[in-house]
Amino acid sequence: MTVRLAPLDYSDLKRCAELERILFAGDDPWSESTLRAELDHGHQYFGAYVEGVGLVGYAGISVLGTLRDAEASVHTIGVDPGWQGRGIGKALLRALLAVADEFAAPVFLEVRTDNEAALALYQAHGFGRIGLRRRYYQPSGADAYTMARPAVVGEKAQKDGTT
């Protein structure tokens, strides 16, 4: 199985919205129009593609600020349940972190407190818990941890002298 990561295309938004409904059924899954707005606003989104299958995962991040004072926020990571446990989520997260690292930006995210697989993934990539948001996810009322990873200086930031 070869998984290819590439920038997410507008033509994939219907599939992303379908995965949102599957993955986040008890909460408020993002619609196709919400995902379209994310791309329209210039946020970085990646798709995970398997030849002969198509899109099996997606992830997005925003970077706000300039190279010297940027801050990044992971907006979403989702992998088709039939493709979970194969390193696709890890590959998508690494792609997002590479974007943040080019801006030497700390990265923030929210994750359900009961999502043990995601918590382990984030902790393995340098994230630590910095807060708790009670009843963050609606309508389920599930709690979320706020997590952060300190800035890592990427190649672009090094070349521009931000270190």
Show where each model-derived region lies:
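Conserved catalytic-core motifs of GNAT/GCN5-like acyltransferases
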Residues: 108-110, 128-145
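Short acidic/glycine-enriched loop/turn segments that link adjacent beta-strands
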Residues: 67-70, 115, 137-143
